[in-house]
Amino acid sequence: MDADPPRLYAPPPGFTRLRLTVAWDGRDYAGWQEQRNAVSVQETLQTALHALGGEGALRPVSAGRTDAGVHAEAMPLHWDVPTTFRVPLVQLPRALNAWLPASVSVLSAEVAPAGFHARFSCTERRYVYRLWVAPQRHPLWAGRALHVPGPLDAEAMNRAAQSLIGLHDFAAFATREDRQTVRDLLRLEVQPQGELWDIHVAGESFLRHMVRGLVGTLLLVGQGKLGAAEVEGILASRERARAGANVPPGGLYFAGAEYGVRRVEGRSGNGGEPGTHRGR
């Protein structure tokens, strides 16, 4: 299979590029990206670095820009810090965490490989959407999993999911966008684990709210409100109104990312701007 060579990016002169992995509880934040009149994860990290003498650092860049309420289990990011920054790299996660609130944690830090860009070098993004499938809600999962009181047909949901995997036009499942809407969906799988269900979603890039629209549609299938075979027709229609509604953001987690050679076969055709696909 043919492959593209990875595109190379370098920090500005006088800066060292670091690669960090960060996790956060999205309930406290208006999303990843810094914005006025709201607390963001990006701004929270910058404040912690400034406390360590890193005022000259550029803004951190993440593999994906999550919306308000969305969590991250392992979000890669790069951070260009001045070469004069003196905190030893081995101590940086602990030092940052001492200044960060309990809802954000730096899990690891290293010097980024040459040419690494957290957003543009990313070849696969993984998400998990969590459901609490039980007659009664559970307080420990409030804002962390969607409560579904009725039974769900996992087998039907996975049949519908299989019909969506691959290179397709996903306009029917995403918030309306002006740019092209073809994406390569690498994984869509429902995994029940007792009352806690995980829906795994993976691809190089996603349209705005696409993951939440896919999950909302699978929920209709699981509830018997939509036939598994009907999902292919919804996909072909490109009509957002025919698919399920976006599920709430609190059940969505950015689970991880991969970096490697980007595939030519099955590419979304929009690999240059994966990080603009906010909200999932």
From Swiss-Prot:
SUPFAM superfamilies: Pseudouridine synthase. Pfam families: PseudoU_synth_1. The keyword Isomerase applies. HAMAP family: TruA. The gene is truA. This is tRNA pseudouridine synthase A. Its EC number is 5.4.99.12. It is an enzyme of class 5 (isomerase). Substrate binds at residue 127. It catalyses: uridine(38/39/40) in tRNA = pseudouridine(38/39/40) in tRNA. Keywords: Isomerase, tRNA processing. The active site is at 67 (nucleophile). Formation of pseudouridine at positions 38, 39 and 40 in the anticodon stem and loop of transfer RNAs. One of its GO terms (biological process) is tRNA pseudouridine synthesis. Belongs to the tRNA pseudouridine synthase TruA family. Gene3D superfamilies: Pseudouridine synthase I, catalytic domain, C-terminal subdomain (3.30.70.660), Pseudouridine synthase I, catalytic domain, N-terminal subdomain (3.30.70.580). GO terms for molecular function: pseudouridine synthase activity; RNA binding; tRNA pseudouridine(38-40) synthase activity. It comes from the Bacteria. Homodimer.
